[in-house]
Amino acid sequence: MILVSSCLGGIECRYNGSHAASEKIRKLVDEKKAVMACPELLGGFSTPREPAEIIGGTGEDVLNGTAKIVTASGEDVTELYMEGAAKTLAYAKEINASAVILKENSPSCGSGFIYNGTFSGKKITGSGVTAALLKQAGYRVISENELNDIL
């Protein structure tokens, strides 16, 4: 079973209330080859919500306590992101996920790129906190841009 970001499956759960649906991912879900999860909703956020970025590093740094996740207005939301990451990892274990496809650039789900923490639209190489936790646990984590690598 493949675990995918809910927004890639067409659920309107992104920070701005939109989705990022991929027809290939929707097909995987429809064929019962994939299931969806949104780490941010699992962490307790609602939709829409204020944008957030990792300040001071990447998801790996958030996990080791040297970076945090804050909203555009400055609220520290690190704990909610950590809770969502932990719940997503538990779900991946529960379904015995063979791979995980997450939404690129997200402070939760980015697997190769995230925003740089300045809310300027600039990106850096790195993972979001959920992607980092899943990678540390040994899961193969890719973005929607790498979908053909596993299909």
UniProtKB/Swiss-Prot annotation:
Gene this chain is encoded by: ybbK
Protein name: Uncharacterized protein YbbK
Pfam families in the record: 2-thiour_desulf
